[in-house]
Amino acid sequence: MAAPVDGSSGGWAARALRRALALTSLTTLALLASLTGLLLSGPAGALPTLGPGWQRQNPDPPVSRTRSLLLDAASGQLRLEDGFHPDAVAWANLTNAIRETGWAYLDLSTNGRYNDSLQAYAAGVVEASVSEELIYMHWMNTVVNYCGPFEYEVGYCEKLKNFLEANLEWMQREMELNPDSPYWHQVRLTLLQLKGLEDSYEGRLTFPTGRFTIKPLGFLLLQISGDLEDLEPALNKTNTKPSLGSGSCSALIKLLPGGHDLLVAHNTWNSYQNMLRIIKKYRLQFREGPQEEYPLVAGNNLVFSSYPGTIFSGDDFYILGSGLVTLETTIGNKNPALWKYVQPQGCVLEWIRNVVANRLALDGATWADVFKRFNSGTYNNQWMIVDYKAFLPNGPSPGSRVLTILEQIPGMVVVADKTAELYKTTYWASYNIPYFETVFNASGLQALVAQYGDWFSYTKNPRAKIFQRDQSLVEDMDAMVRLMRYNDFLHDPLSLCEACNPKPNAENAISARSDLNPANGSYPFQALHQRAHGGIDVKVTSFTLAKYMSMLAASGPTWDQCPPFQWSKSPFHSMLHMGQPDLWMFSPIRVPWD
């Protein structure tokens, strides 16, 4: 049961601010909502303090901004300066083209003359300094009321705060007990980057030399949005976010005719409130371990689709300088008996394991070995690791190493090389249902198949059938984009839901448009209802593009066979969507790093 904040000492402020938020424009909202940090808080004061950038009147970031973090050798003090400085610890540029292309672009580099820890902290600092307005708006659109400030489920929020604090404390102990471990070195760097992001946003620059704290309900919330999907049921949250059957991404890996190329594509399914998007390029200079004799990590250079204030992808889709492309779709867990494996000690949350594996791995097998350590049982996904180093254009199957598949649920991780299957069938499709029978059965999906039918089966799900039917049409990049944006639910028989009224359902497509389902329809489970949810992008790369850390990308809900999504004309026009374009009608672009 949600506990309203009105009963607390800040209740008058909550009521006043709610009335103000209901009546005001988005521009004014940026100013009014800033009061929240002063007047209200959840169990741990979830809303971050506004940074110095909020002295400006315009809440949108400029078209382009570059900032550098410098270290004063004499005083040891860090300071931010506008522009690029070659001696800086780190520097970043944000180019904001959200209203032109649907994307902003972040280009961030660190300086190998400084130690890894300072580089990591500095990376967080400069990212926040160039994107603070977008971070604020994304926070307001997505997590401002998660465990406060207006109302929250007290019991769950206290359990979540305690879980995260215990987990952070356990990781700090492991870092201290294993000072020479490359694994724990990378975990520490990841948390230092998050610390730098939060410190910079709050207007303070204090590099931590020993133990440091991360706010459990601060910017960590932006990193753990995927982990929360499983922490909520594991911690017995009464009102959980995920809808039964809700998809969370489609992916396709396609071997083109004659084996002349291998395309990798992904589209993210998410709430439309999450459509403030940034494609990020990191050029880091981290070493594998804490001593200088360690070599540089394989995955220092990476490009990924992401969100403001998020230091990993979350979609997930990465192009790595190691020659790997890593991506996932969420499979979840529907077996309550497995939640016992979700514990704060002995686990590293998925978002961190993802970052560490991307840095350290040279191939799919080592990626899986790193990732499966300290399985948290949260953000349970099917991961696909494509190794372009093993792919031979126009050549025969190398037999192994091109494609590794990993599936995780609480208490279980299954890994297999699927190169032979990829070359036999010419494609691998992923659509939120486990491939491995042991994972499928253990995660409780058999019961859902028995109750609801083929919609929850691996081979007969609507997306499985559409991929099987249409993957042979993919002969180039443009055709891949078309398939990944495909949604002809009004005319495609594979989009029909026999138990629904009306039967055509916009969820049953490669790129969902659940906003187009009638509000007054009847549906057997929640995912098929009308929702402000669907496919919100597409990203595609190839053997050649990946060499140049590049991709084709389109932002926003598909409009190929459907009308474009427009906030002002949608049933969800009153949902907060600060900083977003009203009309989402963007074509694919090649990401312009130069």
UniProtKB/Swiss-Prot annotation:
Gene3D superfamilies: 3.60.60.20, Phospholipase B-like, domain 1, Phospholipase B-like, domain 2. Residues 1-46 form the signal peptide. Disulfide bonds join C147-C157, C497-C500. It is an enzyme of class 3 (hydrolase). Its main location: other. GO terms for molecular function: phospholipase activity. Its EC number is 3.1.1.-. The p76 protein is synthesized as a 76 kDa precursor which is then processed into a N-terminal 28 kDa form and a C-terminal 40 kDa form. The C-terminal peptide is further processed into a 15 kDa form. Glycosylated; contains mannose 6-phosphate sugars. GO terms for cellular component: lysosomal lumen; lysosome. The keyword Signal applies. It is found in: Lysosome lumen. Keywords: Disulfide bond, Glycoprotein, Hydrolase, Lipid degradation, Lipid metabolism, Lysosome, Signal. Present at highest levels in spleen, lung and brain (at protein level). Glycans are attached at N93, N115, N236, N441, N520. InterPro entries: PLipase_B-like, PLipase_B-like_dom1, PLipase_B-like_dom2, PLipase_B-like_dom3. It comes from the Eukaryota. One of its GO terms (biological process) is lipid catabolic process. The keyword Disulfide bond applies. Belongs to the phospholipase B-like family. Interacts with IGF2R. Putative phospholipase. This is Putative phospholipase B-like 2.
